[in-house]
Each structure stands twice: as C-alpha cells, then as structure tokens.
C-alpha cells in the first residue's frame, strides 16, 4: 500500500516465481520469469484529483493497470577479507513483451494502444538499473561508503509512461519520482 497522506492511497497486489543461483560464493544470479502485479487506486483526495486532471503524465502513471514482467539480476560482492570491499548489482526488467507478441499473433499491431489483460490495460516497458557501492576502512571504528545508483526506464508499445511503482525516486515518503 502506497499511502500519501492528503493525496492518495494506492494498492499493489503481486505474485512472482523466482529462481536464485550462486555460481560462486561472491556471484549471485536471480531470474524471475513470471511476475504479475496489479496496481489500483483505492482513494484519491479532491486535491490530488485536481492535480491528475491537470497532468496527462500523472493520469497515465497513476492509472489502474496490470504489470506482467520478467526480471534478471546479477550481483557481485567482493570477499569480506578485502580491506575496501565493493558491491555491484545490475538488474534488467521487461514488461509485457511476450503478451504483446501474443496479441500480434492474433492480428494486433505492436504499437496499438489500449490492449488489455483481464479487461484492464497493461504496462509495457524496459528497465535497466545498476547499483555500486565501495567501502573504505578509515580507522578500526570508522568507514566511508560511496554509493552510486543509476537506471533508465523506457515505456513503449501499450504504455505512454512507466507505472508509478517502476519509476525512479529520491528521498523517502515525500520523494520525487522521475
């Protein structure tokens, strides 16, 4: 449940099938061939409704929709014995490409909008993220940590924008999403 006091309450119901493997102690692979999410608005205040009506982007990003996706993650963590260890992770997600291929098999065009899954629109996007951190041991009881997180999401096909839950953000409860 995403609860933005004074604006909205959004629910996300999901389930997934995930396989995890460790090719080596320090290298991990995670593959999720089936992730199904349904995102819907439970409540919107009049103030938020006014904002949504003024912004086509918000209207699309906050609409009720299915998000059928697949995801693969690779992560590496250097040995704990190293004085200045690192952690690196790369994640690739895609949504609804197989579903859209099924629609194409029955005559729909890839670029057609308003295709549905269980009578609700579905999201279609490609997302790549990477996360890197390095720790420097300064003294016995103090460390300095550098952290970089980057990503890009591209909505296409059946979607104009990525779902709210897939957008990048900074901060906490009052975050900025882009």
Language-model-detected regions and their locations in the chain:
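Transmembrane beta-strand segments of outer-membrane beta-barrel domains in Gram-negative
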Residues: 1-151
